[in-house]
Amino acid sequence: MRITIVTIFPEMVEVIKKYGVIARAVERGIVEINVENLRDYTTDRHRTVDDYQYGGGYGMVMKPEPFFRFYESYVEKYGKPYVILTSPQGRIFNYKIAEELSKKDDIVIFCGRYEGIDERVMSIVDDEISIGDYILTGGELPAMVITDAVVRLVPGVVERESVERESFHQGLLDHPVYTRPYEYKGMKVPDVLLSGDHEKVELWRRKESIKKTLAKRPDLFLAKELDEMDKLAIIELFRELMEKC
């Protein structure tokens, strides 16, 4: 997979490929992450990427020419990519979209700034994505969020078993996790986790995931198709509830 982020602040974005899982994926050649400075595709000595908007109004608008110059150069070199514009008007990013994008071979992400991008650029954009209903100063952080979430789902980046056990992949929030010490400030690790009984541990984890999801994200639970472990966990939770009555 190749991901190219187009921005006027390349130094801000470069760090994403220098740390952790993504850095290892880049080093191993599983993914290629490039950061392009949009100003390199300007032609004036001031490297101008914005201008006043027609019709008047507050704020500057990003000019179309640099985006088209980049795009045409890119297509000539690599072929047509899947182009994403980070935008508060886009569809809200989630795990399902991350899975969808992880199957793409070549992604370009345009980072918006100022009051927006000249509408004509939309003729080369395939998708608009937002990371939430709030306004940021630019599209760099959303581009990094999208890249991080997508890359870790690319086969070989993270162990498949780890991905399959994550929140959202199973349609449930994660169960509580603990590490040493066994007791801290009077709070103990649940004994079932020290039992060595893998079936009991798995059942406990699923019960806790269901409880947490029902409390915090009932929408996820309502959309989930229950498997056998889910049903066993719900029966066990009901029994525990009845015993307390």
Curated annotation (Swiss-Prot):
One Gene Ontology MF term: tRNA (guanine(37)-N1)-methyltransferase activity
Biological process, per Gene Ontology: tRNA N1-guanine methylation
Function (record text): Specifically methylates guanosine-37 in various tRNAs.
Principal localisation: cytoplasm
InterPro entries per record: Alpha/beta_knot_MTases (IPR029028), tRNA_m1G_MeTrfase_C_sf (IPR023148), tRNA_m1G_MeTrfase_TrmD (IPR002649), tRNA_m1G_MTases_N (IPR029026), tRNA_MeTrfase_TRMD/TRM10 (IPR016009)
Xref: NCBIfam families: PRK00026.1, trmD
Swiss-Prot/TrEMBL catalytic activity: guanosine(37) in tRNA + S-adenosyl-L-methionine = N(1)-methylguanosine(37) in tRNA + S-adenosyl-L-homocysteine + H(+)
Protein name (Swiss-Prot/TrEMBL): tRNA (guanine-N(1)-)-methyltransferase
Record-level GO cellular component terms: cytosol
Subcellular location: Cytoplasm
Annotated organism of origin: Thermotoga maritima (strain ATCC 43589 / DSM 3109 / JCM 10099 / NBRC 100826 / MSB8)
Record keyword Cell wall biogenesis/degradation present: no
HAMAP family in UniProt: TrmD
Tagged with keyword Ribonucleoprotein: no
Signal peptide: none
Subunit structure: Homodimer.
Gene from which this protein is expressed: trmD
Domain of life per record: Bacteria
EC number assigned by the record: 2.1.1.228
